Amino acid sequence: MIYFDNAATSFYKPPQVVGAAVSTIKNLSVNAGRGGHFMSLKGARLMTSAREKIAAFFGAIDASFVIFTPGCTAALNTALFGLNLAGKHVITTALEHNSVLRPLFELKRRGDISLTVIN
């Protein structure tokens, strides 16, 4: 996973980012691909284009492997709870971010994994 979440809470945003966000909010506030109307289809095309550009940039073999989440915590939850970790032993450190530790502790509580936290 590539961590880009700090941009969501960082003070300085490049003018291009602000401009794109404002333009999208003003002109294209739709659920992309969730309907058959013009604006929804336009949003879907824009999202697909972004997904393809990101896939090409990172060398992903398929643009459908690129997913968008509201932030890093949601991405980590999706990954950790989506993996088949049943019966696995996970080793992490006490310095790990809370967004990783909490799902791991929950997986341990459920009995899905055994967990070692190194101090």
Language-model features and meaning:
Residues M1-N119:
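Pyridoxal 5′-phosphate
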